[in-house]
Curated annotation (Swiss-Prot):
One of its GO terms (cellular component) is cytosol. CDD domains: ABC_MutS1. This protein is involved in the repair of mismatches in DNA. It is possible that it carries out the mismatch recognition step. This protein has a weak ATPase activity. SUPFAM superfamilies: DNA repair protein MutS, domain I, DNA repair protein MutS, domain II, DNA repair protein MutS, domain III, P-loop containing nucleoside triphosphate hydrolases. The gene is mutS. This is DNA mismatch repair protein MutS. GO terms for biological process: mismatch repair. NCBIfam families: mutS1, PRK05399.1. Belongs to the DNA mismatch repair MutS family. Keywords: ATP-binding, DNA damage, DNA repair, DNA-binding, Nucleotide-binding. GO terms for molecular function: ATP binding; ATP-dependent DNA damage sensor activity; damaged DNA binding; mismatched DNA binding.
Length: 885
């Protein structure tokens, strides 16, 4: 909004002056200004909101000679409008009336009580049940020459209070943001760091908010510690600067302290198996390549009974630990749950978990004093159910350390439960303003006021009986409505019997309504009691919220344990329902999967063909050939998914599986243009390949699918050959290398650590049947024309392709420099790889092939065909005897 001069400001009405002062403090935020039962927006805010929310744009008179553009939303429906705006990346300042209109001189006092931004959501109506919302701040660290040396990250889940720090290399920013998926990113004013497209809504804040010394002190104050040494964060200067800005911003949006942010976790990139953005996308962990939520690994695994468990599952899938100890502990717990006795059966446990509330988010709202009555009743009911839940798992905790730890953490906070039980009504109203929230017996004054209000009915019945007897009016009625209060109604024909102390209150067509001194006295007392009861209830509710604040750490402890128990039980249910097994781990290099299955694809088809996959020190690269649609990509992805599931702690879809150390998983599968980044399909492909070649280690799992297909045949083949050799000779990583360049199948002759496998298929007439079985050795052809036919390519095109294929094969056979000569040893100055020799095809075609080309089968008689067959056999034997391959 344009800054107004003092003269222009003075020309506005007092109410608009109040609005403009508030708006000046929130220039980049939509201000929802409370006026009665509506939140109003003015000037540019009104125009923007009308456009985004499809509201009617009106005018409200004029101020300073200018028409006031205005749009509004009803206060009772504000959450649905906030949800829409937040999804669009907008922020909204909620300005409430905090003064009393009856006593205010001039405009009622108003104040911004909170600011709703994409990264600071806590209201249940604004949050997705199964997705965490993160606010992230980033601060770049520079050396003395001003060169960026690292980026400090701090991110906060305000709904739960979870705060994390990390410092990364500048080139790792895209991968980190893909992993964290922040909803809002804070950066310093004037910063030149480019935020990747689609990473989240960005917000510029003053650069001084990122001051390292201030940030470190603010972080210590927040955690109530003297230093950050105990968290391992003392040396993360850039991250501490980011944390300072983060905490300052979050507290400002809430208008209060962040009481539930009391712990800190420092993340180290070596703690988790590395998954770059391409890998997370290609493996479809939580989102398909089409951008849908299902079918994905997450959608398959998420049978959690609580939303806390579902959110933890998403976190675990994106953060698989490198150390197998965590996975083994989780799998031990799954085994214990599967083997539990009848009184602690998995089904009974999951049935109990379905009654559990979202303790994590309720605790967050409690800490911010925004918990609603039904939040507290849900918290009470959950805590009351904990003893029975613990009893169900007590029989099996001895068999699993993880379950023993969960059991100990599920001890209900007794004092907290006592307070909730005594203070909150069994079934409270949704809002405090509706009354009926505080339990009877908790406060004597409130009970007395309620008795006065609730005993109105009996008083009116008694009064009606007395007045009928006193007046002789048999149809006299004593009633109440919100407009006229209490009254005595007498029909027209009986008004002559009305006593002198009746005072007319309302005249109707067929009746008169009166008030008496006795009824007026009771009315004042009853209505006053209702108002005072609501005010008392509001004060009591606020005091209960304050009294619950000391229990926040215990509530967080219980929430964490419930989420883990629920997720482990969901893993156990999946293992039982889908016939999965517990993997094993070894310190030796290698991957052994027997009869592995793609978990997601298997759930979509009637029958899935299981396949083995084996890697070791003597077998590091599998060259995978076979037809399109034959299952090469599925086989590659299933290997990576089974490995990831094993390290996450789940059972896996296989007959057996054993894994050595895995530090990263890379995928180079498919590609599309990066139009925004100005990169072609081939450039995207080569960029991903370069990252793999530069970063893969002997403990990395690499998936390479048809590398080199985005350029000319010879260029693509040369690159594929060189990349495969580099992965073998230098990276020595586990590699699944799918290709249609059959020339590459000769690599195992040069590198014993490479092996050929193929996806089998059989021809049926001009069609093809895919067997989806992985067999040793190379494929003999690609069946491209048959696949095209299956895809519905018109028959004339297929016939023309067959004819041209025959021509190309004839041309290739007669070439003196066949394509396979790429594998001949190049000059030493050009190729820095050792042992670059590879066998070449023979220069002259086989004489039997020459003979076959000259034959027209349709012109042969049966006897001639038989004679020709013997002649061809003689040619083959003669050719082999001369020493030809």
């Amino acid at each position: 909004m344009t800054t107004l001069s003092p003269e222009a400001f003075a020309g506005h009405t007092p109410m608009m002056q109040q609005y403009l002062r508030i708006k000046a403090d929130h220039p980049d935020t939509l201000v929802f200004y409370r006026m009665g039962d509506f939140y109003e927006l003015f000037f540019e805010d009104a125009e923007k909101a009308a456009r985004l929310l499809d509201l009617t744009l009106t005018q409200r008179g004029a101020s300073a000679g200018t028409p006031i553009k205005m749009a509004g939303v009803p206060h009772h429906a504000v959450e649905q409008y906030l949800a829409k705006l937040v999804k669009m990346g907008e922020s909204v300042a909620i300005c409430e009336q905090i003064g009393d209109p009856a006593t205010s001189k001039g405009p009622v006092e108003r104040k911004v009580v909170r600011v709703v931004t994409p990264g600071t959501l806590t209201d249940a109506a604004l949050l997705s049940d199964k997705n965490d919302v993160y606010l992230l701040a980033m601060c770049t660290g520079h050396n003395k020459r001003g060169v960026a040396v690292n980026i400090g990250l701090a991110w906060l889940n305000l709904a739960s209070g979870a705060l994390r720090l990390a410092e990364i290399e500048p080139d790792q920013l895209a991968a980190a943001l893909e992993r964290i998926r922040p909803a809002e990113i804070l950066t310093p004013d004037g910063a030149t760091d480019a935020i990747p497209a689609g990473a989240g809504a960005s917000k510029r804040v003053p650069a001084w908010h990122f001051d390292i010394a201030s940030g470190t002190q603010r972080l210590c104050d927040q955690l109530d510690v003297a230093s950050l040494d105990g968290f391992g964060a003392h040396s993360l200067t850039s991250a501490c600067g980011a944390a300072g800005a983060l905490l300052l911003y979050a507290a400002a949006t809430q208008g209060q302290q962040l009481r539930h942010v009391r712990s800190l976790k420092v993340e180290n990139e070596t703690e988790y198996i590395g998954l770059d953005p391409a890998t997370r996308r290609n493996l479809e962990l939580t989102e398909t390549l089409r951008g849908t939520e299902s079918p994905t690994l997450y959608s398959l695994l998420d049978t959690c009974c609580t939303t806390m468990g579902s959110r933890l599952l998403r976190h675990w899938l994106h953060h698989p630990p490198r150390a197998s100890v965590a996975a083994q502990s989780r799998q031990q717990a799954i085994g214990a749950l599967l083997d539990a006795p009848a009184n602690a059966s998995l089904d009974a446990l999951r049935s109990a978990l379905r009654q559990i509330a979202d303790v994590e988010r309720i605790t967050g709202r409690l800490a911010l004093l925004s918990a609603r009555p039904r939040d507290l009743s849900s918290l009470r009911d959950t805590f009351a159910a904990l003893p029975a839940l613990r009893e169900r798992i007590s029989a099996i905790v001895a068999n699993a350390d993880a379950l023993a730890r969960v059991d100990a953490a599920l001890a209900p906070p007794a004092e907290c439960l006592d307070l909730l039980t005594s203070a909150i009504a069994p079934e409270p109203a949704a809002m405090v303003r509706d009354g009926g929230v505080i339990a009877r017996g908790y406060d004597a004054e409130l009970d007395e006021l309620r008795d006065i209000s609730e005993n109105c009915g009996q008083f009116l019945i008694d009064l009606e009986a007395r007045e009928r007897a006193r007046t002789g009016i048999a149809n006299l009625r004593v009633e109440y409505n919100k407009v006229h209060g209490f009254y005595i109604e007498v029909t027209r024909g009986q008004t002559d019997k009305v006593p002198d102390d009746y005072r007319r209150r309302q005249t109707l067509k067929n009746a008169e309504r009166y008030i008496t001194p006795e009824l007026k006295t009771f009315e004042d007392k009853a209505l006053s009691a209702q108002e005072r009861a609501l005010a008392r209830e509001r004060a009591l509710y606020d005091s209960v919220l304050q009294a619950l604040l000391p229990f926040i750490p215990e509530c967080q402890r219980v929430a964490s344990a419930l989420a883990e128990l629920d997720l482990l039980a969901a893993f156990a249910e999946r293992a039982r329902a889908l016939d999965w097994v517990a993997p094993t781990f070894t310190d030796e290099i290698g991957i052994e999967i027997e009869q592995g299955r793609h978990p997601v694809v298997e759930a979509q088809v009637e029958q899935f063909i299981a396949n083995d996959c084996r890697f070791g020190t003597e077998r590091k690269l599998l060259l995978i050939t076979g037809p399109n649609m034959g299952g090469k990509s599925t086989f590659m992805r299933q290997t990576a998914l089974i490995a990831l599931m094993a390290y996450v702690g789940s059972y896996v879809p296989a007959k057996s599986a054993c894994f050595g150390p895995i530090d990263r998983i890379f995928t180079r599968i498919g590609a599309a243009d990066d139009l925004a980044g100005g990169r072609s399909t081939f450039m995207v492909e080569m960029t991903e390949a370069a990252a793999i070649l530069n970063d893969a280690t002997p403990q990395s799992l690499v998936l390479m699918d048809e590398i080199g297909r985005g350029t000319s045949t010879f260029d693509g083949l040369a690159l594929a050959w060189a990349i495969a050799r580099h992965l073998l000779a230098h990276n020595a990583c586990y590699t699944l290398f799918a290709t249609h360049y059959f020339e590459l199948t000769q690599l195992p002759a040069e590198f014993p650590q490479a092996a050929n496998v193929h996806l089998s298929a059989v021809e049926h007439g001009h069609g093809i049947v895919f067997l989806h079985a992985v067999n040793e050795g190379p494929a003999n052809q690609s069946y491209g024309l048959q696949v095209a036919q299956l895809a519905g390519v018109p028959a004339p095109v297929i016939r023309a392709a067959r004819k041209h294929l025959a021509y190309l094969e004839q041309q290739s056979a007669s070439q003196h420099t066949p394509q396979l000569d790429l594998f001949s040893a190049p000059p030493a100055a050009v190729d820095d790889l050792e042992c670059a020799d590879a066998p070449a095809l023979p220069d002259t075609p086989h004489p039997a092939l020459e003979k076959l080309r000259d034959i027209d089968p349709d012109d042969l008689k049966p006897r001639e065909a038989l004679d020709l067959l013997y002649e061809l056999r003689t040619l083959v034997r003669s050719h082999d005897a001369d020493g030809h391959a």
